[in-house]
Amino acid sequence: MYSINRIGIHGISNKILSRPKFFHSSSSIFSLNQNLNNFKNNNNYILNGYNKITHNHHHQTLFHRHYSNLKQEQENKQQNVGKNSETSPSSTTTTENITTATTATTKTDIKETQNSTMSMLKTVFKYLWPKDNNDSKIRIITSVLLLLSAKVLTVQIPFIFKDIVDSLTTTQSEMLTLPLGLLLAYGAVKITSNGFQELRQTIFSKVAHDAIRDVSCSTFKRLHQLDLTFHLSRQTGSLSRIIDRGGRGINFLLNSILFHVVPTAFEISLVSYVMYTTLGWEYSALSLATIAAYTVFTVKVTKWRTQFRVKMNKMDNEASNKMMDSLINFETVKYFNNDALEVERYHNYLKEYDKASLKTTSSLSFLNFGQALIFSLSMTAMMIMAAQGVVQGNLSVGDLVLVNGLLFQISLPLNFLGTVYREIKQSLVDMDHLFSLLNLNPKISDNKDSKPLKLENGTIVFRDISFKYNDSVQVLNNVSFECEGGKRIAIVGSSGSGKSTLLRLLYRFYDVSSGSIEIDGQDIRGIQLESLRKHIGVVPQDTVLFNDTIYYNIAYGNPNATKEQVENAARAAHIHEVILNMKNGYDTVVGERGLKLSGGEKQRVSIARAILKDSPIVFYDEATSSLDTEKEKLIMDALRELFKGRTTIMIAHRLSTIVDADEIIVLGTGGIILERGNHQQLLELEGKYRSMWLAQQ
């Protein structure tokens, strides 16, 4: 029962349209009408069942769907290494486009899109009709031809039934042969038509999947190109949902336009023309009037129903976000014994969803009744006209069947016009959110004059730099210092003094507000980002690991490293023996964000990863803060030997780890340099550093 709820009405539409069961063995007008009524009753039963499931079981379905969203969101977060490192005091204010993109999944209302429909269709067409892929073009052309052929064959079915019924009124000798031939013809047409439709689906599905994959990969690539400001201001899970919904929107739009809207228009035109030439203009005019009334009613009611669907989706998203937030913070909930509070809050969101869902259900019933009323009145009028023609001798009994069959033929695709219309509108919104992401330009990027870093001795100069996050307070203020190539510089200071910001500026997560940062005389703003970051190894303060094996997480520092190199890096980080004592050794999966490992183990994996990267410039941001004193000394001694002769910048709170630094810089509030010198010189100053040192003894 949950599957119907998740598929939705358009999914039921696809199932019904791809496997019609009417006309199966009827050989008279009475059987035909009975099959018609049975189909409509079954259709109403499906829709009513869908509504009941939505009303009675949406709590369970929401939970399963929300939990699936949580797992998907967590899996996508694992793709982003280092994004959740020490949070800056940055404002969440971003550009309008970024705000729109990151909050898109909480705004499921059907609204005007930022990108024009035509521009989005052109973008999709580029992926659907790639210049260098003739296979996709052949598949599309073949699919369209198969579809049109299936429609032409389908229109022949009412004519075959007409001939069957007419043949039953002939002499006994003729009836022995003619109906058998017509019934065989009916079977052949039916089988061929269904075969064409299924073959079309098989041929086109690869094209759609390729297009969606290419768009999703392009968007994912763009997300990794965007700057840290964007990722710090995003909503949890929103990016993965934008990509997921956008991909599904493209898939639905392609299938609905190519295989529903266009074929329906073709079929209506064909049926109207057949009615005009076979039965007369009155029948054609009445059928077109019926279609017009049906379309206008469906579109207007669907627009009216949208407000209820918007509210329902909003409550769905809020309940989903609440559940994700609660499960992600599972330990916090337990620490404060607030299980009942979390359940109550989740229940309140579901109650609001209930209200919106009931309105959606009742409005759907009104839509279904109105659609049925329009077609029933039209069907009745046409049957009266046809019956009069039979009585007057102008039409045969078979023509009565023909009228019934032709009108029913065009009622099938129109049966789901409201759903298709609404879903197309929603698909355009979802695609707009996806393409808004795809069209975002990073604030930090290469320019046309960017060049690879030409490393000589690795001298780094921070020249009179100032920086603040958006409109927040000044983080760094006219800071200047030089780290000579091969030297070890340590930076200390109170929390919020801008120590970690120096790393983000050096790595170009942000650009300085004023001043410059140079490596061997080259302004880093003129260096290609990939080249710059390739030359800098980082051990972040907050170690975030992929939900993969320990081996994978260490080898991430150099994906081309051999097993021996990975193990040597682990030995240098003093974690090799710890790994071997685990049940699965290097194949041990570390869990979401590495939570199956202790803080010290995660930090040593991070150190091993930096060792494996083997960069000429190394930046430690509280690299051993989670280690005990003994392990810290062992690792620092090993790192000192490994990175001897390399430019090293260390951020530390434990001053004992930096006593041998060539220079120590003490930052104060506002990013001002208070003191600088080596360990002994700073102790003799009897200033900030000395007081910090004495406090730790």
From Swiss-Prot:
SUPFAM superfamilies: ABC transporter transmembrane region, P-loop containing nucleoside triphosphate hydrolases. Pfam families: ABC_membrane (PF00664), ABC_tran (PF00005). One of its GO terms (molecular function) is ATPase-coupled transmembrane transporter activity. The keyword Membrane applies. Residues 460-695 form the ABC transporter domain. Residues 73-111 are annotated as: Disordered. Keywords: ATP-binding, Membrane, Nucleotide-binding, Transmembrane, Transmembrane helix, Transport. Residues 77-107 have a biased composition (Low complexity). ATP binds at residues 493-500. GO terms for cellular component: ATP-binding cassette (ABC) transporter complex; mitochondrial inner membrane; mitochondrion. It is found in: Membrane. Residues 140-426 form the ABC transmembrane type-1 domain. The chain crosses the membrane at residues 140-160, 176-196, 252-272, 279-299, 366-386, 400-420. InterPro entries: AAA+_ATPase, ABC1_TM_dom, ABC1_TM_sf, ABC_transporter-like_ATP-bd, ABC_transporter-like_CS, P-loop_NTPase, Type_1_exporter. Belongs to the ABC transporter superfamily. ABCB family. Metal importer (TC 3.A.1.210) subfamily. This is ABC transporter B family member 5. It comes from Dictyostelium discoideum (Social amoeba).
